[in-house]
Swiss-Prot record:
Catalytic activity: L-asparagine + H2O = L-aspartate + NH4(+)
GO molecular function annotation: asparaginase activity
Family membership noted in the UniProt record: Belongs to the asparaginase 1 family.
Protein name: Probable L-asparaginase 1
Entry's EC annotation: 3.5.1.1
Glycosylated residues (UniProt): N27, N35, N40, N82, N106, N144, N179, N246, N302, N351
Length: 360
């Protein structure tokens, strides 16, 4: 009762000020529909194919990602208004390959402020799929909340026949607005499936069913705008939290790829170029070559550079490797953000090893 009254007053005031919000920033639109009985969901829009535009409805490859604004995306799915009140915030509008750690840090700080508002039930982030899992993992490690955070994308541009974005967006809002979604960390939603940000990865560059979590499985699915979760809320083993509320810049961490005859000195070059840590996308479970390991050992012992051994295979478990830090289940792109956050927190190589090994 009191919650409804307070939320009515709050959002009525907000609704009376659309012009004010527009004047303050053309990127921000306030709750565009309001019904006191519905939960409030904030959508942060980053761009990607879900906001992609092509001049032909049959074009699904050659299109401009990050072209359509959040208000247009929401307008295209009127059913959203049956599930929640929406506030849309356009943070960036680019292909996700253009996003930087600074963009992701900025998004995180916006979300931290948003989830602190008592009347916000959940968060949706619209995002390009190419680096979606990186942002989702970062949010999972930095936004310490039981409120649902759902990162959503699309594989077909908004102008395509059978565009998947509108249904994905509707489903993401449904999940963010549902009480069943509380306490499940950051989730990734595409193609009617709900995955944990900790485990889900993009597995195919073109197909609609690209996001998978083969080993850990999905958290749930959506049918007729009803989220069905397979298990009660749980936290992934080894999930850590990092406080970035006062962080202004993240340390540089580079990823090196493993292959037959790899150049051992690329690791040194990366450090000379400013890397404060390295992640290796090793062969198999994390193999690096003998000459490569020699260089890595030197960087660890002489320059105290933390080096995480991960795997170029999609799944697998990287155990102890030489003097490096095993990534355990984390793929290189997720391990990179974990290492950046660990270095940012001032942790020693031993501390970082302990953090990664929490997964095991
Ligand atoms: N490369 C673009 C991006 O990641 C388009 C891919 C997509 O969103 O599916 O934003």
């Amino acid at each position: 009762m009191w919650r409804s009254i307070i939320s009515f007053l709050f959002f009525s005031v907000a609704l009376c000020q659309p012009f004010l919000f527009q004047k303050r920033s053309s990127n921000i639109s306030d709750f565009i529909s309001f019904n006191a009985s519905l939960p409030n969901v904030t959508i942060f829009a980053m761009g990607g194919t879900i906001a992609g535009y092509a001049s032909s409805s049959t074009e699904t490859v050659d299109y401009a990602a990050g072209s359509v604004g959040i208000a247009t995306l929401v307008d295209a799915v009127p059913a959203i208004k049956n599930f929640s009140n929406i506030r849309g915030v356009q943070v960036t509008n680019v292909g996700s390959e253009e996003l930087t750690p600074a963009n992701v840090l900025n998004l995180t700080q916006l979300i931290l402020a948003e989830v602190a508002k008592p009347d916000v039930h959940g968060i949706v982030v619209t995002h390009g799929t190419d680096s979606l899992e990186e942002t989702a993992m970062f949010l999972d490690m930095t936004v310490n909340t039981t409120k649902p955070i759902v990162v959503v994308g699309a594989m077909r541009p908004s102008t395509a026949i059978s565009a998947d974005g509108p249904m994905n967006l509707l489903n993401a809002v449904v999940v963010a607005a549902s009480n069943r979604s509380i306490g499940r960390g950051t989730m990734i939603l595409l193609n009617d499936r709900i995955g944990s940000a900790f485990y889900t990865t993009k597995t195919n560059g073109n197909m609609l069913d690209t996001f998978k979590s083969y080993e850990a499985g999905f958290l749930g699915m959506i049918l007729d705008q009803r989220p069905h979760f397979f298990y009660s809320p749980a936290t992934p083993t080894g999930k850590v939290h990092f406080d970035v509320s006062n962080t202004t810049e993240l340390p540089a961490v580079e990823i090196l790829y493993g292959y037959q005859g790899l150049n051992p000195n690329l690791a040194k070059a990366a450090v000379d170029l400013g890397a404060k840590g390295l992640v290796l996308a090793g062969m198999g479970a994390a193999s690096w070559t003998d000459p490569g390991n020699e260089v890595i050992d030197g960087l660890i012992s002489n320059q105290s550079i933390p080096v995480v051994y991960s795997h170029r295979t999609m799944d697998g478990f990287s155990d102890y490797y030489y003097n490096g830090i095993p990534s355990y289940f984390q793929n290189p792109q997720k391990a990179r953000y974990m290492l950046m956050l660990s270095i940012n927190a001032g942790y020693s190589i031993q501390n970082i090893t302990d953090i990664f090994s929490l997964e095991y």
